[in-house]
């Protein structure tokens, strides 16, 4: 019994016959209503409007008037009897009102809710002129006779209807156009096309399948339909899941579901995605507008170039390739941003080829020019073909060009490794290289996941080798990783698979590569995903060579045969990189970069090499000049220059940490780089006369750019410092330091074992207020070089506090093998020393060591010169002095003016007197002191003559005419003989000689 009958108990009193008669009348009325709805010329009853009164009273039984006297004037709709099945949606229910079947909403219906699809059509008919009242011009034709849409009354106007039936995609849809409250009756309006309404989800009928809409549901433009047909035939991989609304393809169904749930643009659309697309308002068109041809994307781009960039998001094309790690990018800006990863911004070094730049802009320009290529058609790793998708194959010409470049870059071994004959043509195509490495090698991880009838091209990896290693054959042992061959039958068209070579060991781990292989060391760096899990990537050796090139330039002489020592393989080299200086292997290259920048023992001066490398260096007698006895204390004189780090590294040994360095307690500027960096408030570099705003910048300058960065810390005996005084007798130093590269670059070089200079010439200036003068006025003040066992090899800094016995100094040029005066390089120490002693025109005469040191204003920073100063001017700077300023006169005046008396002296004498202790390990060595810089008032006391500059400052270089003989009459003082450049200004010439002269070229290569 319905709720209507329960609310009116008087209806229960009716007899069973009356109830059956009423039901028959209702059924007849419902069938009559259906006939009127389906008849072409039958007008819609006026009761279609919910608010209009019913035209006919409901038929009743003969006893009806008596029983219905107390009812309301307007009867309420009656729910259909339970015997009638309801096949419509759950939100609606059928009711009978005024003898007509109506549809009532059970719940509140929001605008845009749709039901469908239904099989049928909407036909248009012409209204008859004899009709007295208006009738709808459309007729609803349904295939299903029992469809609930037939019971919906049709409204004459859109204002009267709250739902509409429209045709879309060969089917009928019923959509709510106005909000319908719960219990409201529905009235429908037939339309040919759907109206624009906000998008809402579509409710499918239960009888319809829940599979995605077929492809013909999409309404495409002609060019979009053409593109869709091409894609339908091109995509043969069944594992690709496309989003029809966004045009994005996914290789995982879970990714597609997540996209549809959270990111899809049509997730709030109504009807099908095509309906939501057609409901959008048309956008303004521009003259040069380009529309994306991909289905359902329809993104408008203002220009053809922007459309090309946008199309890469659909095709996966990444034309900009980083040649260092073979990463591909869609835009040039992204690739340039990525290139910054491969640089060391502190030292301005390119991690790939070792290029050193003074400015960041030059370094970035180098990276973009040499290590980035634009290769159209390159595919990124994300969009590389899958297991069932055929990979792109290189045409024969591209393969040949790739082989040509590979042969030119890596030499004959690379060609033999690939199994292809090397081509002698030097013309290279870097785009072919990027296409081969990026498009082919990146397809390997996805291609190996499953089989396919058409195999892709075999993977290929690049190996960088030096040209000087022809004897190292690419042989793989049984325990070494094999070639990364795909697990499929190779096609005859596919190129031969490349073999991943095991890495060659470093020739001399503590030394730099030979000059011939500097251009190829680290030219390419393969990422980890190119190799299989068992392969040994070449990143370790490449990065090791780069670090050796940058930080160990001075250690070339550690092994004369460095080029021929690479005979072993590295079968168990793990992925990542290895720091050969610290004996640490990193699994991540980024960790290796951080280690090299912040923690590596080789980040300081090139003299700092780990002591662990000493046993691998050649023996000491091979490094020492002939005729000098070997030092019996082997641990104290390391055979290789790499051992000099033991003292500079801080506490390399327990003795060093306990006893400390000889100058640890003083503030002498001659201490090591670590002593200068210990003071966090220190920002002034006195060697270069540069003040920095931050201590970190100062530290970087001292490590990589300072003029004294190659100076080894001086050795001093562990003797108690004597009181400062002008008459302190200088004692011969048992271990004088090796003359640094910067000091002996263009100066007159002296031979080892010369007699010491006279003691009066080395008395320190009494007026010097330097804080370290007290500790430096002892026996360590004299720069004498006495022969002894210390002349065998370089200085062992870790043992310098324990050397009280006198001994001969080490060879003056033990760590240097290039004569900058003659521009000749030597690969052995013996040949270099013989050249400097007998053949070099810049070498001083045999008795030059007995002469006092004079200061050259043209050599930074006021460097002392032993021997004939005028001869040094002539050989090093191309200066010719006139007759009044003869060499003997200057030398005759020099010893007399170097006494402790502060009396006025000639112009050239104050500089030798003040620079002598600096050359002989006095209180004024190369390195700046940890304490504050000297005050301006103290400078005149050290150098009494007003024309002379201060002894510790580089400002004297700016006024060479006052500290040297008068300007020459011939004007040659503004001409640089080495660079063949004439200068119009003397200050410009001095700046050139100090910073830019070609004589500094060897020093800038770290």
UniProtKB/Swiss-Prot annotation:
Residues 485-515, 780-791 have a biased composition (Low complexity). Zn(2+) 1 binds at residues 243, 246, 259, 264. Zn(2+) 4 binds at residues 819, 822, 835, 840. It holds the Pfam family zf-C2H2. The keyword Nuclease does not apply. GO terms for molecular function: DNA binding; RNA polymerase II-specific DNA-binding transcription factor binding; transcription corepressor activity; zinc ion binding. This is Zinc finger protein ZFPM1. It comes from Homo sapiens (Human). The gene is ZFPM1.
